[in-house]
Regions:
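Conserved N-terminal beta1-alpha1 strand-loop-helix module at the mouth
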Residues: 1-117, 122-197
Protein backbone atom coordinates (compact mmCIF):
# COMPACT_ATOMS: atom_id res chain seq x y z
CA UNK A 1 0.00 0.00 0.00
CA UNK A 2 1.27 3.46 -0.88
CA UNK A 3 0.30 6.11 1.65
CA UNK A 4 -0.97 9.26 -0.06
CA UNK A 5 0.53 12.45 1.43
CA UNK A 6 -0.96 15.95 1.27
CA UNK A 7 0.90 19.02 2.50
CA UNK A 8 -1.64 21.76 3.22
CA UNK A 9 -1.57 25.49 3.83
CA UNK A 10 1.26 26.34 1.45
CA UNK A 11 1.93 30.07 0.99
CA UNK A 12 5.42 30.28 -0.51
CA UNK A 13 7.01 28.82 -3.62
CA UNK A 14 10.03 27.47 -1.71
CA UNK A 15 7.71 25.32 0.42
CA UNK A 16 5.76 24.15 -2.63
CA UNK A 17 9.07 23.07 -4.17
CA UNK A 18 10.17 21.36 -0.95
CA UNK A 19 6.92 19.37 -0.81
CA UNK A 20 7.31 18.31 -4.45
CA UNK A 21 10.94 17.27 -3.91
CA UNK A 22 9.99 15.35 -0.75
CA UNK A 23 7.47 13.26 -2.70
CA UNK A 24 4.10 14.71 -1.66
CA UNK A 25 1.10 13.55 -3.70
CA UNK A 26 -1.10 16.62 -3.18
CA UNK A 27 -0.58 20.26 -2.21
CA UNK A 28 -3.28 22.25 -0.45
CA UNK A 29 -3.91 25.98 -0.72
CA UNK A 30 -6.22 27.62 1.82
CA UNK A 31 -8.89 30.08 0.67
CA UNK A 32 -10.42 30.74 4.11
CA UNK A 33 -9.60 32.90 7.13
CA UNK A 34 -6.34 31.46 8.43
CA UNK A 35 -2.66 32.35 8.93
CA UNK A 36 -2.22 30.26 5.74
CA UNK A 37 -4.80 32.08 3.62
CA UNK A 38 -3.79 32.90 0.04
CA UNK A 39 -5.62 34.62 -2.80
CA UNK A 40 -6.45 32.65 -5.97
CA UNK A 41 -3.83 34.72 -7.84
CA UNK A 42 -1.13 33.98 -5.23
CA UNK A 43 -1.95 30.27 -5.30
CA UNK A 44 -1.84 30.21 -9.09
CA UNK A 45 1.54 31.94 -9.07
CA UNK A 46 3.28 29.70 -6.52
CA UNK A 47 1.78 26.51 -7.96
CA UNK A 48 2.54 27.20 -11.63
CA UNK A 49 5.34 24.61 -11.81
CA UNK A 50 3.61 21.76 -9.95
CA UNK A 51 3.89 18.56 -12.05
CA UNK A 52 0.59 17.24 -13.40
CA UNK A 53 0.82 14.05 -11.31
CA UNK A 54 0.56 16.09 -8.08
CA UNK A 55 -2.94 17.24 -7.14
CA UNK A 56 -3.60 20.94 -6.50
CA UNK A 57 -6.23 21.18 -3.77
CA UNK A 58 -8.39 24.24 -3.04
CA UNK A 59 -9.26 24.18 0.67
CA UNK A 60 -12.34 26.25 1.52
CA UNK A 61 -14.69 26.64 4.49
CA UNK A 62 -18.34 27.49 3.85
CA UNK A 63 -17.56 29.35 0.60
CA UNK A 64 -20.14 31.23 -1.41
CA UNK A 65 -20.52 30.06 -4.99
CA UNK A 66 -19.09 33.43 -6.07
CA UNK A 67 -15.87 32.96 -4.08
CA UNK A 68 -15.58 29.35 -5.30
CA UNK A 69 -15.99 30.43 -8.93
CA UNK A 70 -13.16 32.96 -8.49
CA UNK A 71 -10.89 30.21 -7.11
CA UNK A 72 -11.96 27.86 -9.90
CA UNK A 73 -11.26 30.42 -12.63
CA UNK A 74 -7.95 31.80 -11.33
CA UNK A 75 -6.39 28.80 -9.58
CA UNK A 76 -7.79 25.89 -11.65
CA UNK A 77 -7.67 23.29 -8.85
CA UNK A 78 -7.81 19.54 -9.37
CA UNK A 79 -9.71 19.08 -6.10
CA UNK A 80 -12.07 21.08 -3.89
CA UNK A 81 -11.86 20.23 -0.18
CA UNK A 82 -14.68 21.67 1.96
CA UNK A 83 -17.08 20.63 4.70
CA UNK A 84 -19.51 18.02 3.37
CA UNK A 85 -22.55 20.30 3.53
CA UNK A 86 -20.80 23.06 1.55
CA UNK A 87 -20.91 21.20 -1.77
CA UNK A 88 -24.69 21.46 -2.13
CA UNK A 89 -24.59 25.21 -2.81
CA UNK A 90 -21.63 25.18 -5.22
CA UNK A 91 -21.46 24.77 -8.97
CA UNK A 92 -18.58 22.29 -9.37
CA UNK A 93 -17.51 20.97 -12.78
CA UNK A 94 -17.05 17.22 -13.16
CA UNK A 95 -13.35 17.78 -13.85
CA UNK A 96 -12.86 18.85 -10.20
CA UNK A 97 -12.70 16.07 -7.62
CA UNK A 98 -14.64 16.67 -4.38
CA UNK A 99 -13.14 15.81 -0.98
CA UNK A 100 -15.77 16.34 1.72
CA UNK A 101 -14.47 17.01 5.23
CA UNK A 102 -16.09 15.01 8.02
CA UNK A 103 -15.23 16.07 11.53
CA UNK A 104 -14.62 13.97 14.61
CA UNK A 105 -17.82 13.56 16.61
CA UNK A 106 -20.05 13.95 13.56
CA UNK A 107 -21.74 11.28 11.50
CA UNK A 108 -19.65 9.68 8.76
CA UNK A 109 -21.82 8.48 5.89
CA UNK A 110 -20.73 5.51 3.82
CA UNK A 111 -19.01 7.53 1.09
CA UNK A 112 -17.40 5.64 -1.75
CA UNK A 113 -14.96 8.39 -2.72
CA UNK A 114 -12.09 10.15 -1.00
CA UNK A 115 -12.87 12.19 2.08
CA UNK A 116 -10.94 14.01 4.81
CA UNK A 117 -11.44 13.10 8.48
CA UNK A 118 -10.28 15.68 10.99
CA UNK A 119 -10.95 17.40 14.29
CA UNK A 120 -13.60 20.01 15.05
CA UNK A 121 -11.38 22.83 13.71
CA UNK A 122 -9.04 22.82 10.73
CA UNK A 123 -5.38 23.83 10.87
CA UNK A 124 -5.05 24.12 14.64
CA UNK A 125 -2.99 21.00 15.31
CA UNK A 126 -5.66 19.22 17.34
CA UNK A 127 -5.02 15.46 17.29
CA UNK A 128 -7.95 13.37 16.09
CA UNK A 129 -8.93 10.28 18.11
CA UNK A 130 -7.15 7.64 16.05
CA UNK A 131 -8.99 4.81 17.77
CA UNK A 132 -12.38 6.12 16.63
CA UNK A 133 -10.95 6.82 13.15
CA UNK A 134 -9.67 3.24 12.89
CA UNK A 135 -13.16 1.72 13.18
CA UNK A 136 -14.80 3.82 10.46
CA UNK A 137 -15.95 1.29 7.86
CA UNK A 138 -14.59 3.06 4.79
CA UNK A 139 -11.22 4.22 6.10
CA UNK A 140 -9.59 2.96 2.88
CA UNK A 141 -10.97 6.19 1.34
CA UNK A 142 -9.98 8.35 4.31
CA UNK A 143 -7.36 11.08 4.27
CA UNK A 144 -6.53 11.46 7.96
CA UNK A 145 -5.85 15.01 9.18
CA UNK A 146 -5.62 16.76 12.52
CA UNK A 147 -2.53 17.06 14.71
CA UNK A 148 -0.21 14.97 12.54
CA UNK A 149 3.51 15.73 12.53
CA UNK A 150 6.78 13.99 11.59
CA UNK A 151 6.95 12.34 15.02
CA UNK A 152 3.49 10.77 15.14
CA UNK A 153 2.44 10.15 11.53
CA UNK A 154 3.86 6.60 11.39
CA UNK A 155 1.92 5.62 14.53
CA UNK A 156 -1.28 7.18 13.11
CA UNK A 157 -0.89 5.25 9.85
CA UNK A 158 -0.27 1.99 11.72
CA UNK A 159 -3.35 2.47 13.90
CA UNK A 160 -5.85 3.88 11.38
CA UNK A 161 -4.59 2.43 8.07
CA UNK A 162 -5.99 5.36 6.04
CA UNK A 163 -5.67 5.93 2.30
CA UNK A 164 -3.67 9.06 3.05
CA UNK A 165 -2.51 11.66 5.55
CA UNK A 166 -2.80 15.45 5.52
CA UNK A 167 -0.60 17.88 7.44
CA UNK A 168 -0.53 21.65 7.88
CA UNK A 169 0.52 23.04 11.28
CA UNK A 170 2.56 19.88 11.98
CA UNK A 171 5.22 21.02 9.50
CA UNK A 172 5.44 24.61 10.71
CA UNK A 173 7.88 26.51 12.92
CA UNK A 174 5.11 29.01 13.76
CA UNK A 175 1.53 29.75 12.61
CA UNK A 176 1.55 29.74 8.81
CA UNK A 177 5.37 29.40 8.65
CA UNK A 178 6.20 26.15 6.87
CA UNK A 179 9.53 24.49 7.65
CA UNK A 180 11.32 22.80 4.72
CA UNK A 181 13.10 20.29 6.97
CA UNK A 182 9.84 19.31 8.71
CA UNK A 183 8.05 18.89 5.36
CA UNK A 184 10.75 16.46 4.21
CA UNK A 185 10.73 14.59 7.53
CA UNK A 186 6.94 14.23 7.44
CA UNK A 187 6.80 12.85 3.90
CA UNK A 188 9.71 10.48 4.63
CA UNK A 189 8.06 9.22 7.83
CA UNK A 190 4.70 8.69 6.11
CA UNK A 191 6.24 6.92 3.12
CA UNK A 192 8.42 4.73 5.39
CA UNK A 193 5.41 3.79 7.52
CA UNK A 194 3.66 2.19 4.56
CA UNK A 195 6.37 -0.48 4.42
CA UNK A 196 5.29 -1.84 7.81
CA UNK A 197 1.63 -2.27 6.78
Amino acid sequence: MTVFVKICGLCEEQHVNAAIEAGADALGFVFAKSPREVTPAQAASISADIPSNILRVAVMLHPTNESWQKVLKEFLPDVLQADAQDFMSLDIPESVEKWPVFRQGGKIPNVSDRYVFEGPQSGCGEIVDWKSASVIKNNNNMILAGGLDPGNVAKAIAMVNPFGVDVSSGVESGPGKKDIHMIKKFVSAAKAAEKSL
